[in-house]
Amino acid sequence: MSGDNPVGRLVVLAGPSAVGKSTVVHRLREEIEDLYFSVSMTTRAPRPGERDGVDYFFVSPEEFQSKIDAGEMLEWADIHGGLQRSGTPAGPVEAALLAGRPVLVEVDLVGARNVASLKPESETVFLAPPSWEVLVERLTGRGTEPEDVITRRLETAKNELTAQHEFKHVVVNEDVEKAVSDIKEILVGRR
């Protein structure tokens, strides 16, 4: 790409566990040809079917800390009561933005706040459930976490839902097609 390309648009997506972020992100990646999706780094174990370097970079807590110490993370946080750490490697995001590509970063609430603080030009999007009951049903229906983890995730979700007013955009994920369309407009639309 030539040096006179406009800098790409950075969209920061957050929302509670089981709101449908992964589904929406997957669809956006299919529909937006030049989209750069930032692969997060995490200390949690992979879920069935997840691939290292594709879904997440799965690392040890020690390796994660070394990335922080080296200044290689755009944002990071201890999440779910300190059970794990998650964050966004900075280098690939910066390179994609400079190349003029739309960039999608999926993070938790703390990560969204941190990126918005560092990059106030970013478009922050909160993906909300249609109701609390739907969110509980989605989270408990996964069958991938034990009861104590589900309880902790629901506590985290309550906190996250009260912070949605901090975001520039709130998209309710009642209909996946509409949610994808709304976020696609934010990513590549010329508002």
From Swiss-Prot:
<feature type="domain" description="Guanylate kinase-like">
    <location>
        <begin position="8"/>
        <end position="188"/>
    </location>
</feature>
<dbReference type="InterPro" id="IPR008145">
    <property type="entry name" value="GK/Ca_channel_bsu"/>
</dbReference>
<dbReference type="GO" id="GO:0005524">
    <property type="term" value="F:ATP binding"/>
</dbReference>
<comment type="function">
    <text>Essential for recycling GMP and indirectly, cGMP.</text>
</comment>
<dbReference type="Pfam" id="PF00625">
    <property type="entry name" value="Guanylate_kin"/>
</dbReference>
<dbReference type="GO" id="GO:0004385">
    <property type="term" value="F:guanylate kinase activity"/>
</dbReference>
<protein>
    <recommendedName>
        <fullName>Guanylate kinase</fullName>
        <ecNumber>2.7.4.8</ecNumber>
    </recommendedName>
</protein>
<dbReference type="InterPro" id="IPR017665">
    <property type="entry name" value="Guanylate_kinase"/>
</dbReference>
<keyword id="KW-0808">Transferase</keyword>
<dbReference type="InterPro" id="IPR020590">
    <property type="entry name" value="Guanylate_kinase_CS"/>
</dbReference>
<dbReference type="InterPro" id="IPR027417">
    <property type="entry name" value="P-loop_NTPase"/>
</dbReference>
<keyword id="KW-0418">Kinase</keyword>
<dbReference type="GO" id="GO:0005829">
    <property type="term" value="C:cytosol"/>
</dbReference>
<dbReference type="InterPro" id="IPR008144">
    <property type="entry name" value="Guanylate_kin-like_dom"/>
</dbReference>
<keyword id="KW-0547">Nucleotide-binding</keyword>
<keyword id="KW-0963">Cytoplasm</keyword>
<comment type="similarity">
    <text>Belongs to the guanylate kinase family.</text>
</comment>
<keyword id="KW-0067">ATP-binding</keyword>
<feature type="binding site">
    <location>
        <begin position="15"/>
        <end position="22"/>
    </location>
    <ligand>
        <name>ATP</name>
    </ligand>
</feature>
